[in-house]
């Protein structure tokens, strides 16, 4: 498990960069200046952060936690904080309330109230790339109003509180237009460009209807069932098992199981398992300890030719 202690007690721009004030399991280092800092987590990746306005910090996230199922965060907050998460690749989840977990994936945008989320985060695919914008609404509100007079961050914060503390916007062209360009910016104009795009995003929020959004949360029991199903599917890659059998084994309807699994992992059950098998086979091939015939059997293919065809279609080579 990967532990992070978050300490955001004083001024936003002074102390948000102490996000990793105490990190267990891995060493880390922080380098940079007043406007840009790199939080290097070694083998686990890095955060690249930019101080945009008073109370607003942008962070680009690139982490790899293949050997850690969960990230536990202990936070200390003295201000009203909004978090805006955009997923470029991978999947991310965190707890909301006592028995809800929300998941989002590639292209999705999630806005949440920080102190209404709990301490456990999950990265189902073992990696995550994206960006996160931290907004101290009390510190940033007057400044943002200079540029967007009709948009009030505090009112927006209170609106989210009435909507379970979060809202999720699935990937769409509008989000891609506003957010997508942030990942590819000439170094000479980065800071100015990030400021403009941040204001554009808030302007987009000012005309977006957040009153109705889909139910995207799962209960902790549903998440546990999905995790148990995943473990069963990968612990014996040679076995053949149907969705009906899985549903019966875990006391859940077939339809609910399929929906829950896709929410967590972003793909239908057996598409996910097929890709897992082929990724595992790729590692075995690279290891050089087994023949193709042996590997095909280890990942559940009845013949080397069927395995070779599937591998070629997925990986692009044999």
Regions inferred by a protein language model and the residue ranges of each:
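Terminal helix-turn-helix DNA-binding modules in bacterial transcription factors
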Residues: 227-235, 240, 244-245, 263-305
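Short Lys/Arg-enriched alpha/beta "domain-start" segment
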Residues: 1-32
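…primarily DNA-binding HTH/wHTH and HhH modules…
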Residues: 287, 298, 308-318
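Conserved hydrophobic/aromatic pocket- or pore-lining residues that grip, position, or stack substrates
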Residues: 194, 233, 257
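Alpha-helical bundle regulatory/interaction domains
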Residues: 4-7, 95, 100-219, 226, ...
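Short hydrophobic/aromatic patch on the recognition helix
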Residues: 256-257, 261, 306-307, 311
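N-terminal functional module of multi-domain proteins
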Residues: 27-127
């Amino acid at each position: 498990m990967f532990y992070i202690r978050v300490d955001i007690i004083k001024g936003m721009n002074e102390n948000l960069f102490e996000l990793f004030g105490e990190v267990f399991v891995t060493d880390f280092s922080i380098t940079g200046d007043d406007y840009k800092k790199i939080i290097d987590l070694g083998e686990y990746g890095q955060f690249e952060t930019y101080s945009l306005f008073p109370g607003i910090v942008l962070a680009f996230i690139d982490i790899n936690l293949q050997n850690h199922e969960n990230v536990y965060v202990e936070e200390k907050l003295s201000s009203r904080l909004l978090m805006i998460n955009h997923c470029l690749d991978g999947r991310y989840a965190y707890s909301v309330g006592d028995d809800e977990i929300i998941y989002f994936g590639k292209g999705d945008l999630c806005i949440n109230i920080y102190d209404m989320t709990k301490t456990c985060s999950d990265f189902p695919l073992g990696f995550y790339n994206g960006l996160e914008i931290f907004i101290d609404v009390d510190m940033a509100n007057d400044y943002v109003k200079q540029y967007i007079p009709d948009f009030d961050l505090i009112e927006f914060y209170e609106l989210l509180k009435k909507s379970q503390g979060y809202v999720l916007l699935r990937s769409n062209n509008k989000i891609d237009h506003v957010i997508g360009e942030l990942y590819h910016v000439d170094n000479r104009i980065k800071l100015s460009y990030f400021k403009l795009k941040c204001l554009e995003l808030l302007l987009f929020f000012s005309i977006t209807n957040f009153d109705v959004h889909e139910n995207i949360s799962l209960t902790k029991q549903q998440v546990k069932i999905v995790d148990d199903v995943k473990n069963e599917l990968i612990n014996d890659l040679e076995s053949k098992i149907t969705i009906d059998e899985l549903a019966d084994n875990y006391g859940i309807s077939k339809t609910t199981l399929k929906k829950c699994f896709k929410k967590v992992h972003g793909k239908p059950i057996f598409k996910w398992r097929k890709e897992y098998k082929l990724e595992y086979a790729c590692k075995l091939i690279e290891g050089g300890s087994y023949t193709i015939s042996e590997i095909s059997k280890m990942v559940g293919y009845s013949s080397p030719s069927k395995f070779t065809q599937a591998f070629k279609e997925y990986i692009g080579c044999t």
